[in-house]
Amino acid sequence: VAFGTLTSISESKFQFGLLYAGSDDGKIHVSKDGGVSWQLISGNLPQNLWVSRVAASTHKKERVYATLNGYRNDIFESYAFVSEDFGVTWNSISLGLTNAVNIIVEDSANENVLYVGTDNGLFISLDKGATWQDFSNGMPKVAVHDLVIQTKAKELIVGTHGRSIYKIDISKVQELTNEVLAKNIHLFKVNDRIKSDRWGSQNYAWGKPSEPSQEIWFYSNADGVVNFTIT
């Protein structure tokens, strides 16, 4: 693919006309006037790569994320960066990622949570990119090319290369604040259940009786056995 093609564009929700654009020659530009003028902001990033994604933060006006990859030069290192000053300076948040990075998404409800799609699956960070964990959770280890958060349903939609589309409930992930993570164990709110007269009854003669169930979600900061009593 010849140089000169835009590969990613993102508009800040905090300011009309605050735009970021990435291209296939590794350059990232910012416009603060709706595209009338543009300023190069990728001078101190690795050069001659492909801007796989540029994403304005949904939590802070000055913050922007960028991911790069070097497919054309057989470079498969991970490149993920964040800027807290409109791209004037950048910090790498790639440590712990594997293979080329295709996309980065900031959680819409919790600014500490980031999702990254790589050529080797899905990753998550709970600390703004300081550390990363595999978040594939049973998904095949294939390239993840797109991620979208469905804010109303609190679901992460994952688009892969040749292995379909997946979704995962991230409602509890969004509740993993610093206060929750500091606890030894945390029990998330249990949804209310309304008793039904159909519980224990059969819908048809050869069917199984209806059996109610309840999911109980909790967070523990260490492996181990936990005993608890439900009253």
Segments the model singles out, each with a brief description of its role:
Residues 1-204, 211-212, 221:
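Beta-propeller blade termini and top-face loops
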Residues 214-218, 223-231:
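Beta-strand-rich binding/interaction modules
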